[in-house]
Structure formats: C-alpha cells, structure tokens
Regions:
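Active-site beta-strand termini and strand-to-loop segments that position acidic
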Residues: 77-79
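Polybasic/polar functional segments that serve as interface/processing modules
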Residues: 1-30, 39-75, 89-93, 100-115
Length: 115
C-alpha cells in the first residue's frame, strides 16, 4: 500500500481530481490496481506524470512502460502490478474505466499525515 499511497499523494500534490484506486487483482492478470485521475490540461497531466515518476524513483521503483506523454491527453504508466491512468476529464468521462471495471473493489487511500 505504500506505493499506492505514494502515487496518490504525488497526484494530489499536482491537484489531480477524482483520484480513484481500484483493486482489479481478482478480475484480471493485467495488474493488481488501477489508479485513475483527471486533469484539466496537457500541462497538468505531464506535471502529474513527472511527479509520480519522481516520487516512485525515490522509492527506487521504475516505471516499466509509459504511453501518451507527448500527446498529454491520457498517459498510462505501468508499474507492473499498479497501472496509473492520468487523463483529461473528457476522455475519462468518455471511456469510463470505472464503469468498465465496475466489479473492482474501490480502495480508499488516506493521504492525511496524522501526528
């Protein structure tokens, strides 16, 4: 869960919206988790991608594959068991990945630092 929390916090730091974490482990062999978020611009999408990569690099975890960075509308980041989708709001609504994976368990990630 540390890796998931790191990714969610990195997205939140760059003001990504509607961050959803889906446990897909019982539904597919593609991975264990999807993390999906919305951004308002290409610049914000790239900022989120860069921040996720930076924070994961700090944990010595490298992105296995990345698609869509140049376009900036929808970037997929593959961390093996965690797949991150950083999308503009329009394609997110159109493709509705959450509905496609409706049987997945939604995970709540607490990003507050308790003292």
């Amino acid at each position: 869960m540390e890796r998931i929390k790191t990714i969610v916090e990195a997205l939140d730091d760059k003001r990504a919206k509607n961050i959803d974490v889906l446990d897909i482990s019982k539904l597919t062999s593609l991975g264990d988790y999807f993390i999906i978020c919305s951004c308002g611009s290409d610049t914000q999408v790239r900022a989120c991608v860069d921040n996720v990569e930076e924070k994961m690099d700090e944990l010595e975890i490298t992105c296995v594959h990345k698609e869509g960075y140049t376009n900036g509308t929808w970037v997929l980041m593959d961390y093996g068991d965690i797949i991150v989708h950083i999308m503009h709001e329009e394609p997110r609504l159109f493709y509705a990945l959450e509905k496609l994976w409706d049987d997945a368990v939604k995970i709540v990630v607490d990003t507050t630092d308790e003292v």
